[in-house]
C-alpha cells in the first residue's frame, strides 16, 4: 500500500480526458439522445455508452442486458418477462424496443430512483437509441459545431449474447467501419470487462481501434475474467499485449486514508503506466462520494493531480471540465 500527500499544482492538465458516463447522466436519464446532447454541450471529450443486441441483431444503447431498470417495459409488454421477472433485450425486436420510454434508473428493488434528486423518476419523455443514432448525432455535432466528441463504447454480456447466437463485438466493428472508425488514432475506445472479447477483437478481427480492459471485482460475477490477476504486475503486462488502457473501479485505485490522513493508493496506476497503459477509473458522482473525498472537486483533485490518471468517467462532465479549466488557469 502506498501513502501519498502532494500539493494541488502537482500535475499539468493537458490531455486529461473527461468521459461522460452514459451521457450527462447526472442531469438526464442515462443512455438517451438528450443525455448525449447535453454531454456535448458540457464539453465532454468522450461519450461513454454501453451496447446490447436485440432479437433482430440490432445494437441498442443500454447498460443492462434487461429492460427493467430504465424503461416502462412491464407496462408496455406485460407477461413478456422471463422466469426471473426480467425482460432480456435479446428477446425483443428493435421495433418493440422503440415502443418503450426511458426513465431515470430504478433502485434494485424497483421501488424508486437509484439516485434521489436527479431528473424526475416518473418522467417518460425519452426513448432507447440505437448505436447508429448516436453515431449520426456525433457526426452531426462535428458538421454543425466543428468539434468532435469521441466515443467510448462498452460491449455488454458477451456470454449471454452467445447463448442467443448473437455476436455484438462483430456487429459493432462492422458498424464502426461504415462510419470510418478504423485506426488507433480515431476518437474512439472500445471497452469490456471480458478479456476474451478484447483479445478476439484484436487477434481475430484485427481491429486497430483503441481497446480498454475494464477491471471489476471477481465477486461481481461480470465475466470469467480473473480481475484479481489483472490487477497484478504480471496481469497488467498481459493486458498490454491486447489493450491500450485499463478502466479500474476507483476504489481499486484509492482505498481510503490512513490514521494520519494520507491517501492509501494501491499502485495500480503506476504499474499500468509502466506498461504504457492509459488509466480511466470509474465512476465519479457528485451524489456518491467516497469517504476519502469531502467534495466532488476534492475527488477530482485526488485522481487528476495526485494519482495522475489519464481520464475519468463521470455522471457530471460539466463539473469535471470546469475543474480542469480552473486548474489550467493556475
Regions found by a protein language model. Name each.
Residues 3-330:
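Phosphate-group recognition and catalysis centered on beta-loop-alpha active-site segments
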Amino acid at each position: 500500500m502506498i501513502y501519498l500527500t502532494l500539493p494541488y499544482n502537482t500535475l499539468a492538465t493537458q490531455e486529461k480526458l473527461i468521459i461522460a458516463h452514459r451521457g450527462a447522466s447526472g442531469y438526464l436519464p442515462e443512455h438517451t439522445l438528450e443525455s448525449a446532447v447535453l454531454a456535448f454541450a458540457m464539453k465532454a471529450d468522450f461519450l461513454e455508452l454501453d451496447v446490447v443486441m436485440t432479437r433482430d441483431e440490432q445494437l441498442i444503447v443500454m447498460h443492462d442486458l434487461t429492460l427493467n431498470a430504465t424503461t416502462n417495459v412491464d407496462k408496455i409488454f406485460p407477461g413478456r418477462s422471463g422466469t426471473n421477472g426480467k425482460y432480456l433485450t435479446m428477446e425483443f425486436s428493435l421495433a418493440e424496443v422503440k415502443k418503450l420510454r426511458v426513465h431515470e434508473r430504478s433502485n434494485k428493488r424497483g421501488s424508486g430512483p437509484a439516485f434521489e434528486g436527479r431528473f424526475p423518476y416518473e418522467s417518460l419523455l425519452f426513448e432507447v437509441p440505437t448505436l447508429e443514432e448516436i453515431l449520426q448525432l456525433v457526426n452531426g455535432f462535428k458538421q454543425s459545431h466543428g468539434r468532435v466528441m469521441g466515443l467510448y463504447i462498452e460491449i455488454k454480456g458477451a456470454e449471454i449474447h452467445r447463448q442467443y447466437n448473437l455476436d455484438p463485438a462483430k456487429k459493432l466493428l462492422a458498424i464502426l467501419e461504415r462510419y470510418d472508425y478504423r485506426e488507433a488514432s480515431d476518437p474512439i475506445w472500445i471497452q469490456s470487462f471480458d478479456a476474451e472479447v478484447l483479445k478476439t477483437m484484436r487477434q481475430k478481427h484485427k481491429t486497430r481501434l483503441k481497446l480498454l480492459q475494464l477491471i471489476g471485482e471477481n465477486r461481481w460475477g461480470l465475466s470469467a475474467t480473473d480481475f484479481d490477476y489483472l490487477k497484478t504486475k504480471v496481469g497488467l503486462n498481459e493486458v498490454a499485449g491486447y489493450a491500450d488502457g485499463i478502466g479500474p473501479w476507483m476504489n481499486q485505485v484509492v482505498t481510503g486514508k490512513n490514521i494520519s490522513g494520507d491517501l492509501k493508493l494501491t499502485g495500480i496506476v503506476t504499474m499500468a503506466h509502466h506498461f504504457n497503459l492509459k488509466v480511466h477509473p470509474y465512476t465519479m458522482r457528485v451524489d456518491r462520494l467516497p469517504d476519502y473525498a469531502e467534495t466532488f472537486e476534492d475527488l477530482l483533485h485526488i485522481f487528476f493531480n495526485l494519482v495522475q490518471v489519464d481520464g475519468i468517467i463521470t455522471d457530471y462532465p460539466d463539473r469535471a471540465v470546469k475543474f480542469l479549466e480552473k486548474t489550467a488557469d493556475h
